[in-house]
Amino acid sequence: MKRLISCLTIICALNRSAAAETTSSPCSRWISLLKPVCQRIHQTWTEGHDDMYFSGYAWHNRYTYRPEKIKSYNEAAWGGGLGKSLFDEKGNWHGLYAIAFLDSHRHIEPAVGYAYLKTASVNKDIKAGLGYSVLVTSRVDYDNVPFPGALPWVALFYKRTTVAATYIPGSAGAGNVLYILGKISL
């Protein structure tokens, strides 16, 4: 619960910080190489829709874990979070999020990040996307020390709802988890 409150506090602090910047030059103090990154994040935060995330499943790859280990893992990765997202001028999706969920050992794992998806429209209401997410998370097995990560991300959009998935790579007995989550744009 503390981690969820921490994630929500970070979002509120970012909101206050974004509001304090002038809209004409929100990224003026950034180096020129990173200004486009700052500008896209700022645009997502200020123009994006509010999102509610929910998670519920983490599949551990049966080819990399022993059956008795699989039985000991939690695959009901219940959790949720908040975010902001938008489709840009090219129709691609950008999202900022803060979530917390139960990890494989039933410990709360928070994550804060940015995701980008190159999308293709199937029809007016359905889009499919493929991209990545960069994030900061912490885990009990790493002494709750925050660490960065980058993961592949796929999604299927239907009107205001989204089903997304990422694969956490690893080695035999570590990682190799398909994590599935959903999003509703409010």
From Swiss-Prot:
One CC-aspect GO term: cell outer membrane
Free-text disruption phenotype from the record: Mutant is impaired in stationary-phase survival in low-Mg(2+) medium and shows decreased resistance to different structural classes of CAMPs compared to the wild type. Mutations reduce both the numbers of bacteria recovered during intracellular infection and their cytopathic capacity for U937 macrophages. The mutant is also more defective for lung colonization of A/J mice.
GO terms of biological process kind: lipid A biosynthetic process; symbiont-mediated evasion of recognition by host antimicrobial peptide
Molecular-function GO terms, alphabetical: O-palmitoyltransferase activity
List of catalytic residues: 60, 103, 104
Recorded catalytic activity of this chain's protein: a lipid A + a 1,2-diacyl-sn-glycero-3-phosphocholine = a hepta-acyl lipid A + a 2-acyl-sn-glycero-3-phosphocholine; a lipid IVA + a 1,2-diacyl-sn-glycero-3-phosphocholine = a lipid IVB + a 2-acyl-sn-glycero-3-phosphocholine; a lipid IIA + a 1,2-diacyl-sn-glycero-3-phosphocholine = a lipid IIB + a 2-acyl-sn-glycero-3-phosphocholine
UniProt subcellular location: Cell outer membrane
SUPFAM superfamilies: OMPA-like (SSF56925)
Keyword set, alphabetical order: Acyltransferase, Cell outer membrane, Membrane, Signal, Transferase, Virulence
Main location: membrane
Pfam name, any one: PagP
Quaternary structure, from the entry: Homodimer.
Role according to the record: Transfers a fatty acid residue from the sn-1 position of a phospholipid to the N-linked hydroxyfatty acid chain on the proximal unit of lipid A or its precursors. Confers resistance to cationic antimicrobial peptides (CAMPs). Promotes the ability of L.pneumophila to replicate and/or survive in macrophages. Important for ability to kill macrophages and to promote the virulence.
Family designation: Belongs to the lipid A palmitoyltransferase family.
Record's protein name: Lipid A acyltransferase PagP
Species name: Legionella pneumophila
